Amino acid sequence: TVLVVPAASPWRNLGELAEDAKRRPGAISYSSAGNFSALHTPMAMFTAAAGIDMLHVPFQGGGPALTALLGGTVQALASGTGPVMQHIQAGRLRALATTGATRVPGLPDVPTMAEAGYPDVLYLIWAGLFVPASTPAGLREQIRQAAARAAEDGDAQRALTTAGSPMAYLDGPAFEAFIREDAARLIPAVRRIGRVE
């Protein structure tokens, strides 16, 4: 995800936003697609790591959360890169940091949270293919091979990278290990947000 603010905002980098939020607890607001969503969790991770209090304003979806930022209802948003890329390129929004392990190819000048001083803020929006455990081994293998071919397709890679969502293909055991690592990182973050059963 990428943390964005209006281009007219006073914050030129993540440090300036954090310092302002420290001076004015609860005065700076951010929108999300709802509690525990992919737009809420990375902001909650950032505010915890920075030791700041920002007002969370949940909406019913990413579209309304982005509209609230563009309309001036809130002052910040952590979003997938796709929905905000055109607004960054048009100069309506300023990207302060990304939450991945590496910089986003479409935003090479935007630091990661780790580079900006928050190494514990690592949040990835990802998708994967899953099948029922009862799926025959032969069919599972066909699906894995088809997914690997699709991931190697140059046109698909370029389209996703242009949209701000580069593909990082992981197969079988590597993908399973990634899921376990991601869950281990996110469980404490989600528990800090609030009650989880």
Q: Which residue ranges define each predicted feature?
A:
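Short beta-strand and adjacent tight-turn residues that come in two discontinuous sequence segments
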Residues: 59, 78-80, 98, 123, ...
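C-terminal lobe and pocket-closing loops
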Residues: 84-152, 181-184
